[in-house]
């Protein structure tokens, strides 16, 4: 049996853009993706601190400091909103007991603090 556990999160990132006319996804600074141990095209949940929205999408690589919600997800955020970007992993209970998720805290410019 496997359970779904928090794999990593990018905590309190600032939305820099919302592009309704793009096909879909969230564009994330490539360096933040690496620091969080996430992968391009990985499914993630987006938690908007400002309005309480919670939704799923997938990652595409972006430029330094970029956090952009694309397509339909652009309707769920406003530029300047703070979001938490969360990934999960499936693992056995034994693996989960020793697993530590990666937490990446960022400043207002979406630069990693760690």
Swiss-Prot record:
Pfam families: Asp_decarbox. HAMAP family: PanD. Its EC number is 4.1.1.11. GO terms for biological process: alanine biosynthetic process; pantothenate biosynthetic process. Gene3D superfamilies: 2.40.40.20. InterPro entries: Asp_de-COase-like_dom_sf, Asp_decarbox. GO terms for cellular component: cytosol. Belongs to the PanD family. It catalyses: L-aspartate + H(+) = beta-alanine + CO2. The active site is at residues 25, 58. Keywords: Autocatalytic cleavage, Cytoplasm, Decarboxylase, Lyase, Pantothenate biosynthesis, Pyruvate, Schiff base, Zymogen. Heterooctamer of four alpha and four beta subunits. Its cofactor is pyruvate. Catalyzes the pyruvoyl-dependent decarboxylation of aspartate to produce beta-alanine. Is synthesized initially as an inactive proenzyme, which is activated by self-cleavage at a specific serine bond to produce a beta-subunit with a hydroxyl group at its C-terminus and an alpha-subunit with a pyruvoyl group at its N-terminus. The keyword Zinc does not apply. Its main location: cytoplasm. It comes from Campylobacter hominis (strain ATCC BAA-381 / DSM 21671 / CCUG 45161 / LMG 19568 / NCTC 13146 / CH001A). The modification Pyruvic acid (Ser) is found at residue 25. The keyword Isomerase does not apply. Substrate binds at residues 57, 71-73. It is found in: Cytoplasm. This is Aspartate 1-decarboxylase. The gene is panD. GO terms for molecular function: aspartate 1-decarboxylase activity. SUPFAM superfamilies: ADC-like.
């Amino acid at each position: 049996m496997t359970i779904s556990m928090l794999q990593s999160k990018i905590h309190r990132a600032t939305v820099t853009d919302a592009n309704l006319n793009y096909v879909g996804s969230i564009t994330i600074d490539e360096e933040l993706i690496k620091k969080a141990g996430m992968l391009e095209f990985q499914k993630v949940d987006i938690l908007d601190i400002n309005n309480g929205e919670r939704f799923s999408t997938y990652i595409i690589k972006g430029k330094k400091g970029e956090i952009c919600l694309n397509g339909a997800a652009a309707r769920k955020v406003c530029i300047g909103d703070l979001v938490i970007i969360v990934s999960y992993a499936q693992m056995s209970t034994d693996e989960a007991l020793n697993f530590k998720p990666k937490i990446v805290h960022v400043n207002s410019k979406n630069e990693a603090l760690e």
